[in-house]
Design a protein with these regions (language model features):
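Active-site rim/loop-helix segments in enzyme catalytic domains that contact anionic ligands
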Residues: 1-106, 236
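Metal-dependent de-N-acetylase/amidase catalytic core
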Residues: 1-6, 29, 88-237
């Protein structure tokens, strides 16, 4: 069976910067990838678009959707937007159930989202807690008779913009050397946040240095960092 990876971000561009390489790598290896945006980031993540004095919320959403859809396609993934609003992102019972339904529907082997702390972004921790809780609901052992459940997906956190301030501890490096050009092409679609392209290209090189030292593999030129949340179950060390 093809390995299934689902990346759920607070805003429509979050996946590109932080997990674009891992998504493309999974697809390159025969996997199936889905990107889910809880919101478009139309209020707090679209500064370039709001320089137009005639700009509107609906037009920003339209542009952000097109950008994210094109970026996901570059990586070989599908894109889905929940359009729940941002700044602030607010998750009630209905929104939580929607996210749980999205997880059940896709049934990922690997689920990726934000860290639980981010002092510079009010929406990222909200998204983390929502996805973490929705995962538990979607994979809730012992309640199969009440609603459909899925096999518990592995949960990873992608690297935040300021990792030292977000309690991020990398436990896994993904070698994205072979797909880095795809990540660059995907990032190029995000014109509403174009200033981040250089930052995350450089970050991939920094993490590749760490990956080389950790693995001894001198061929790693670009990498992405992730933090594993759920213990890995193996038959031997």
């Amino acid at each position: 069976m093809s390995r299934r990876i689902q990346v759920i971000g607070a805003h429509s561009a979050d996946f590109v910067w932080r997990a674009g390489g891992a998504i493309a790598k999974a697809v390159e290896l025969g996997g199936i990838a889905e990107v889910v945006a809880i919101s478009y980031g139309e209020r707090g993540e679209s500064g370039e678009l709001w320089k137009d004095e005639n700009q509107t919320i609906e037009n920003v959403k339209r542009i952000r959707h097109a950008e994210a859809e094109a970026a996901a396609a570059e990586l070989g993934a599908s894109f889905r937007a929940l359009d729940l609003g941002d700044y602030p992102l607010q998750i009630g019972a209905n929104e939580l159930n929607l996210i749980a339904d999205v997880i059940r529907e896709f049934a990922p082997d690997v689920l990726v989202t934000h860290t639980d702390t981010d002092p510079f972004n009010p929406d990222h921790p909200v998204a983390h807690h929502a996805v973490d809780r929705a995962r538990s609901l979607a994979a809730g052992a012992g309640v199969q008779s009440a609603f459909k459940t899925v096999r518990p997906p592995q949960l990873f956190l992608f690297e935040p913009h300021q990792p030292e301030l977000c309690n991020f501890m990398p436990t896994t490096f993904v070698d994205i050397t072979s797909v880095f050009e795809k990540k660059q092409a995907a990032m190029a679609h995000m014109k509403a946040q174009g200033h981040l392209q250089t930052y995350y290209a450089e970050r991939a090189e920094h993490r590749a240095n760490h990956a080389r030292r950790a693995s001894g593999n001198s061929e790693v030129r670009q990498a992405e960092a992730f933090q594993r949340v759920i213990p890995q179950v193996v038959s031997e060390l």
